[in-house]
Amino acid sequence: MTPVVALVGRPNVGKSTLFNRLTRTRNALVADFPGLTRDRKYGHANIAGHDFIVIDTGGIDGTEEGVEEKMAEQSLLAIKEADVVLFLVDARAGLLPADVGIAQYLRQRNKTTVVVANKTDGIDADSHIAEFYQLGLGEVEPIAAAQGRGVTQLIEQVLAPLAEKLEAQAVDSDENVADDEQDEWDSDFDFDNEEDTALLDEALEEDQEETDDKNIKIAIVGRPNVGKSTLTNRILGEERVVVYDMPGTTRDSIYIPMERDGQQYTIIDTAGVRKRGKVHLAVEKFSVIKTLQAIQDANVVLLTIDARDGVSDQDLSLLGFILNAGKSLVIVVNKWDGLSQDIKDNVKSELDRRLDFIDFARVHFISALHGSGVGNLFSSIQEAYQCATKKMTTSMLTRILQLAMDDHQPPLVNGRRVKLKYAHPGGYNPPIIVIHGNQIEKLPDSYKRYLSNYFRKSLKIIGSPIRVLFQEGNNPFAGKKNKLTPSQLRKRKRLMKFIKKSKR
């Protein structure tokens, strides 16, 4: 399960700056849910090789009378569901009553907390952070988030060890997600050698065999009241299986195993399968953290949309997180029954307009309440999963690359054409294709999109994102001095003597 890091503290202590540092972007609004989480930000980060969900909880205006009264409900939820809390304080402003109140709240919750003293640039950090030890939360980590100072040390000495500890405790850690930023290849590997490429294909095939006959995890996600629980119950009701919880898997998400046509599935219900009478607030039905974790843990995601409301900004935010996580996708438009033909046409037109960037995903129009169209979902789920784990070989991908270049050659850069040499598989779930060549960094984005679409069409990948990575060919002479042969040295010596004589 992906660990969750919550950034808490008073306003203007640098939480958003640290958020951007950890997520390595200046606008990392992976999932922003207006009206539900207000100014809370959710982002995905890869820290020291470990995946995290990072939350900026916004400023907490606590007072010495009681910080709990001033904490927003979503801040409380974020702290409750976080694995690690980074408590930011302002080293320049010193210890304030609000800091003491927040620290007291965190101690009461017995949450793993790290005090981070920000804005230590240009001051004596040791003397300024000393007073924060009286908070009783252990070591204080000094940083200057705006300049990036101390952030690497915070990652290496605090977050990375915590991630390793959490991963060691995880019960279900069979995710097979490839990280393109850490996709490294041996520079000595010869892709022109058939024996070497055969070994690579064999190794990747072994990885793929682990996904065969696997229990497919399906996450049903969406905004509140779009019919997620109804769809879950309809799927289970059709199959007449006994629903039972699997304790210890994830916080409030319920993992429900089922079987259909000999294939094992696990439905991840982010609604918690609670009785309707016990749910008083809409916000109780929808936890951002539970949804993001369910997406990370799933093989196929069913993004459920209310046909009567259309595609909202919240739907697009969830969609962005699904694509960034590299998950297979099926779009489910619920509550399709009872709509007039004009409204149905308008809904389809809006879907085509707002979701044109994910034309690879199947769209199903269903009624979870009445069951119409629900049974057809599994064919698309199977198709998306099989495409995500599709077998690819180096020779196959290189042949497709050559056909793509024959149809449309790479552009000229400074009078020289970008040369693409070969392609090989880089992983599955999602399919990753690595292309090697020269002057790769000068290849325009338009041509990269062309190659991505060409590979998708040639491989017939539907329902799954595809990642095409580009790597510059290694220069065998890079970093080496030009070493002359003995005959060249003698020739150079004679030439130097001739030059000296001519100058006399």
UniProtKB/Swiss-Prot annotation:
Binding residues for GTP 2: 222-229, 269-273, 334-337
Protein keywords: GTP-binding, Nucleotide-binding, Repeat, Ribosome biogenesis
One Pfam assignment: MMR_HSR1
GO biological process: ribosome biogenesis
Residue span(s) of domain KH-like: 390-474
Entry-linked InterPro entries: AAA+_ATPase, G_ENGA, GTP-bd, GTPase_Der, KH_dom-like, KH_dom-like_a/b, P-loop_NTPase, Small_GTP-bd
UniProt region (Disordered), positions on chain: 171-190
Residues reported to bind GTP 1: 9-16, 56-60, 118-121
Span of domain EngA-type G: 3-166, 216-389
Keyword flag Nucleotide-binding: yes
Composition skew (Acidic residues), residue ranges: 172-190
GO molecular function: ATP hydrolysis activity; GTP binding; ribosome binding
Entry's family note: Belongs to the TRAFAC class TrmE-Era-EngA-EngB-Septin-like GTPase superfamily. EngA (Der) GTPase family.
Function noted in UniProt: GTPase that plays an essential role in the late steps of ribosome biogenesis.
SUBUNIT field: Associates with the 50S ribosomal subunit.
Protein name from the UniProt record: GTPase Der
